[in-house]
Amino acid sequence: MVLASLSTGVIARIMHGEVVDAPVLQILAIKKINSAADSERYRILISDGKYFNSYAMLASQLNVMQHNGELEEFTIVQLDKYVTSLVGKDGAGKRVLIISELTVVNPGAEVKSKIGEPVTYENAAKQDLAPKPAVTSNSKPIAKKEPSHNNNNNIVMNSSINSGMTHPISSLSPYQNKWVIKARVTSKSGIRTWSNARGEGKLFSMDLMDESGEIRATAFKEQCDKFYDLIQVDSVYYISKCQLKPANKQYSSLNNAYEMTFSGETVVQLCEDTDDDPIPEIKYNLVPISDVSGMENKAAVDTIGICKEVGELQSFVARTTNKEFKKRDITLVDMSNSAISLTLWGDDAVNFDGHVQPVILVKGTRINEFNGGKSLSLGGGSIMKINPDIPEAHKLRGWFDNGGGDSVANMVSARTGGGSFSTEWMTLKDARARNLGSGDKPDYFQCKAVVHIVKQENAFYRACPQSDCNKKVVDEGNDQFRCEKCNALFPNFKYRLLINMSIGDWTSNRWVSSFNEVGEQLLGHTSQEVGEALENDPAKAEQIFSALNFTSHIFKLRCKNEVYGDMTRNKLTVQSVAPINHKEYNKHLLKELQELTGIGSSN
């Protein structure tokens, strides 16, 4: 067994600001420290054989090495990436060594003892601190920049900012007053507004990333107006003088115990030269459109495609908030000969120009499942790039311009409406005979059927009034309703429909369930009207429900076996309903007759 030699005396040089490449050190102790938020942090005692430093921290991404027992006492490690940061009021406190990447050279079980008799680096002799030839390192200080002159206050750095060395995101905590981070914007939300009893306002949020980690930042009201147009996704900025507080994990899934809030003193400057201290690029895990059909509902996905079709801008008003929303559906195609619908919202929908059929790259877009197909929706944490300068985009452009998008074989997104028969046509008896729904994933089919019976009992429930929540509320009395999901009390609620009915075709009858939107379409009334009638006007409710009896429709059905207690039931759910398009339906019947009789089609 050969033990690596420690980089003797190097700790004193590092802690006094010198850049040293890949120092080899020994871990003498490691201890979990208390954190003000729900996050693990580890402090280590580290030695170079001559000096030790008790103010060293592991970045959170290295916690797994501690959990796996790789960083035991006496382990010899090589520091691959690290930074030093001043912690304390006005930057006058202790300098902390933060390690973001390391390599285990010799496990502690091999070393078995402390190497040398190290003393604190603060006792280092002056000769140990003499300048040494610097080598390239990942912890290079940022050169101080001349202040820029701009009429927008706080948009650029000024003389009050100590830009001599940036701080890693992983080192930030509410106990620091002076710091500057250099970070890339990985995502940026649209402007969101709110209005309640305490007032009204607006906000937007962004996710920031450097080599050490990531953090969420939010700008409210005046800061929202000041910084929204300045901040651009994928650009790198110096940012300072934000407020730090424990992260609200209900709204952020980032691996950081804290989040930032912009204040009136916040300073932001675009970093135009990132060569000296590179910030990681945004990474894309691009998935072919054809693969999206096999992915889970609500999963996030990165993909790239050509915008082949652009839908009209649509506006609608939320019933509960009376807030207007705008959206636009576009169709993307790619070299897997597949197409998928992507929904844009807000300003993205209003400003989108697809007449030149650009390349569209999306990151973190959400998969929605509807009518047996999959579509994409650009959410607040998603990124959309138009004609990105990457090899995949250039290759896709060449494919499309040479006729590649002319024959798309696979439409991943479901088509809606009474005239579409892309889903397999089947009778209710055939669906049962073929044992649909018994696999791991649900099956889908459609049929023409008549409504026989509609149950009024339990046809609705009281739901959370928030536009993005449909959870059932609990009546607390005194006109107060609690939503467990939102963990909030509301003075009102909204009705949601859950209708069970018996439908039949010429082969069989089945009980099916339909949810809110389908129920409203079938009954011809809003859920609010139906709920109020069921609770307050039984005669009107009877009229609404009886009008549905003995009406025929095209039903698109989802079929899946579900377990209730120790019993398995085959459940049918109405995914969509449409009036009968007799011309299209007759075409289907003629095709069935031709297949049954073997008679070819005639003109």
Swiss-Prot record:
Disulfide bonds: none
Entry GO MF terms: damaged DNA binding; single-stranded DNA binding; single-stranded telomeric DNA binding; zinc ion binding
Any Gene Ontology biological process: nucleotide-excision repair
Keyword Membrane: no
DNA-binding region as annotated in the record: 179-252
The keyword Zinc-finger appears for this protein: yes
Predominant place of localization: nucleus
One Pfam family per UniProt: Rep-A_N
Region called Disordered, residue ranges: 131-152
Modified residues (Phosphoserine): S160, S420
Record's subcellular location: Nucleus
Key words, A-Z: DNA replication, DNA-binding, Metal-binding, Nucleus, Phosphoprotein, Zinc, Zinc-finger
GO CC, alphabetical: DNA replication factor A complex; nucleus
Zinc finger (C4-type) residue numbers: 464-486
Assembly and interaction partners: Component of the heterotrimeric canonical replication protein A complex (RPA).
Family per similarity comment: Belongs to the replication factor A protein 1 family.
Protein name: Replication protein A 70 kDa DNA-binding subunit
Lineage: Eukaryota, Metazoa, Ecdysozoa, Arthropoda, Hexapoda
Gene name in the database record: RPA1
